[in-house]
């Protein structure tokens, strides 16, 4: 960490590095990190101000299966103490990480309900986004 930062900021950064699983990579430049670790850096940056709301756009795109599960777990963990809005076209991500589904088609909300009320997400998505 940067020794010029006040101790509270230094501790915050260290806590975030640990929380997102970057402790072993902390002294590397971002460009030297894998895509999965770069995603973690982005999540840590988003968390720096301890926001009540976290908006993530396609946070798992391009990750290998191990990285994918790690990021999913991290996002679920972050969602325990804040609202997380996840934008994705990958329905498996919705099933794995979301408690509520909002499907927007051409700027219009077509579906807005808890995921537990949706029997078949794929079919719901098809019906909500079909062109009439």
Question: What are the residue ranges of the model-derived segments?
Answer:
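Catalytic Walker B motif of ABC-type/P-loop ATPase nucleotide-binding domains
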Residues: 54-58
